[in-house]
Amino acid sequence: MPEGRIVLAATPIGNLGDASARLRELLAEADVIAAEDTRTARRLCAGLGVTPTGRVVAHHEHNEAASTQGLLDQVRGGATVAVVSDAGMPTVSDPGYRLVAAAVSVGLPVTCAPGPSAVTTALALSGLPTDRFAFDGFVPRKDGERRRWLTSLLTEARTVVAFESPQRLADALAVVVEVLGAQRPVCVARELTKLHEEVVRGTAAEVHAWAAERHAAEGIRGEIVLVVGPAAPGAEGEASEADAVAEVAVLVESGTRLKEAVAAVAGAHGMRSRELYQAVLAARG
């Protein structure tokens, strides 16, 4: 019996011309194609001129727990299971990592057919440092959670990449300006590799001004990747006590508990939480 395996197969993020020969071969010959959306997978195959010989089955966040065991059983039986997301690399903010973890835990083979990724494409185009970076998934939706996330980046020495919805982009950038400062370097990458690809680079204030104007005039559409540059060297500890107290107040007003806000701001600036807490209480009178 041939040895089964799982293959994580990266798919184009917008331009079908980026599909590799290996991806075409996998889609044509895999025994099973585990797809985030079976309709999207079938459209991809049609666009590439590929006729799958295997079954196309759903494997997404809502059925991942249930479908994982079935896919592992197929691999045990000698099947090649190709895992594809709607766009880009499976497991990167997409379904698949639980399947990989489960396969690894029982010793089943897992390999990868690498290819396009919105994360690394946006990073490369941003013009921001690429030697150290972090991917933070999606920008938090709720204002308080978003502010806490941005507060954690006050002294972040790495470039940070995150996904954002076009409808929330202008509001998110306004909070970037408020929390990280108008001069923090930022990049917004929209519709990467597609016909209307757009990359906007500048300070947080400049990019926010672009987003606010575009949102008001015609709306912002398409897939968005937000890239936030690292803090300026020596940023840690630069904030005065008054600045830190003000940052705590902003977080508390947005719904963060006082002790959590103090811990976040103190950690970002290398301050002692107890001393900052006392300063906040003193400022409140």
Task: Indicate residue ranges for each PLM-predicted region.
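Glycine-rich, flexible N-terminal cofactor/catalytic loop recognition
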Residues: 1-60
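General beta-strand structural signal in soluble alpha/beta enzymes
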Residues: 36, 110-115, 162, 188
